[in-house]
A protein has these predicted regions:
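Polar/acidic, low-complexity leader/linker segments enriched in S/T/G and N/D
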Residues: 1-40
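A short, compositionally biased
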Residues: 1-7, 88-94, 172-175
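Short amphipathic beta-strand/extended segments with alternating polar/hydrophobic composition
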Residues: 15-24, 106-113, 186-192, 215
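Short beta-strand and beta-hairpin "edge-sheet" elements
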Residues: 30, 96-140
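Oligomerization/assembly interface segments of phage tail-like spikes and tubes
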Residues: 39-41, 45-75, 125-139, 232-233
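Solvent-exposed loop and beta-edge segments used for protein-protein assembly and interaction
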Residues: 54-58, 87-91, 123-127, 161-163, ...
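Short, acidic/charged, Gly/Pro-enriched secondary-structure junctions
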Residues: 65-112
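Intrinsically disordered, low-complexity segments enriched in serine, threonine, and glycine
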Residues: 141-254
Length: 254
């Protein structure tokens, strides 16, 4: 759990207080909607539900306070706004946020619109502004989204949370590997250095000093792994590989 004072939050592990930004009002966060289509075929009573198994992203509006420590200084407003844009990575890419009211979780967000400033000038050194962000449907436990866990050649892994997990695996070494998680087996051939298996994005790739290369052709499988909620699965692997690691990504719905 991260220690945060009321109003504070983390953006990519940087505390908002370092940029003099606080959450003024706790936001309303709606539960993610199931991605479904309802059809009413001719001659059929009622409707049919087509469900693709996923959830929609949720839009959230944040009301924030920036306190620059200066009193009624119009010349500083441009600098303050630029610092705010930079802190939230405006228009660039997804960022990780941990709010004070949910310090065990990481929210994956992107800023969808430019901030709206409620006042055009500083009032006692402060500005109030609003942000509209889009949040992924799942929030992740802080100690399971970045840390690699070593996986022995034979053992059990329990998912203690109420949502299924789709981990990220990393295979280190050279050669071939057979690996089974639960009842699903994946076969890897010709591993050179490393291979990553992203079970959320359904993607197998190699990472060579930050250069990502598609490696789906090195994997044989009917499906990607997942670890069911509140259940244990057996994990076994064998082959010429030296190390297998996992970022478990325990998660809950928003």
């Amino acid at each position: 759990m991260v220690s945060l004072k009321p109003g504070e939050f983390l953006i990519n592990k940087v505390n908002s207080s370092t940029e003099k930004i606080l959450i003024q009002d706790r936001p309303d966060i709606e539960a993610p909607k199931r991605r479904q289509v309802h059809k009413e075929p001719a001659g059929y009573d009622g409707f049919l539900i087509y469900d693709d198994g996923g959830y929609e992203a949720t839009e959230v509006e944040l009301t924030l306070l920036y306190h620059g420590g200066r009193v009624d200084d119009p010349a500083a407003i441009s600098t303050a706004r630029n610092r705010i844009y930079k802190f939230f990575k405006f228009g660039q890419y997804e960022f990780k946020m941990t709010p004070y009211f949910d310090p065990e979780k990481v929210y994956l967000c992107i800023l969808t619109e430019a901030p709206t400033f409620e006042n055009k000038w500083y009032y006692n050194g402060a500005m109030v502004f609003k942000l509209k962000i889009k949040v992924q449907p799942y929030k992740y436990y802080v100690d399971t989204i970045d840390s690699w866990w070593n996986i022995p050649k034979a053992g059990w892994m329990r998912n203690p949370k109420m949502s299924d997990a789709k981990p990220l695996f990393r295979i280190i070494g050279n050669g071939d590997l057979d690996m089974t998680v639960g009842y699903k087996k994946m076969i890897f051939t010709g591993v050179e250095g490393n291979i990553y298996i992203d079970c959320e994005k359904y993607f197998v790739y190699r990472n060579n000093n930050g250069v990502i290369t598609n490696a789906n052709h090195k994997c044989k499988s009917k499906d990607f792994w997942h670890i069911p909620s509140e259940q244990s699965v057996q994990i076994n692997w064998n082959g010429a590989i030296s190390t297998v690691e996992m970022i478990p990504r325990w998660r809950d719905l928003l």
